[in-house]
Swiss-Prot record:
Gene (UniProt): CYTC
Cited PROSITE patterns: CYTC
Location of the protein in the cell: Mitochondrion intermembrane space
GO cellular component terms, semicolon-separated: mitochondrial intermembrane space
Domain of life: Eukaryota
Residues that, per the record, bind heme c: 19, 22-23, 85
Name recorded for this polypeptide: Cytochrome c
Pfam families attached to this UniProt entry: Cytochrom_C
């Protein structure tokens, strides 16, 4: 299974409760504990300027798309062993679809 369009309101709630502590969405908001997510889709792993990524993130070399995020967000440490992202993941497909749909809209 892969990504399918989700609920934006539920995605916003997930972002607020699970992601906003470490990530920003809008251009110019900058990095926090985690890298800024503005321009996320189409970007390569480990490529946000000014953020201190692990070598694992820099060397993964994939492009962030709906499908790569769908897999990554289920279990970040499994997808990129050595990442410093301290998030256990979203196990439910629906939650990942909701969050990715929201991120697609808000990070453009």
């Amino acid at each position: 299974m892969g990504f399918s369009a989700g609920d934006l309101k539920k995605g916003e709630k997930l972002f607020t409760t699970r992601c906003a502590q470490c990530h920003t969405l809008k251009e110019g908001e900058g990095n926090k504990v985690g890298p800024a997510l503005h321009g996320l889709f189409g970007r390569k792993t480990g490529s946000v300027e000014g953020y201190a990524y692990t070598d694992a993130n820099k060397q993964k070399g994939i492009e962030w798309t709906e499908d790569t995020l769908f897999t990554y967000l289920e279990n970040p440490k499994k997808y990129i062993p050595g990442t410093k992202m301290a998030f256990g993941g979203l196990k439910k497909d629906k939650d990942r679809n909701d969050l990715i749909s929201y991120l697609k809209k808000e990070t453009a």
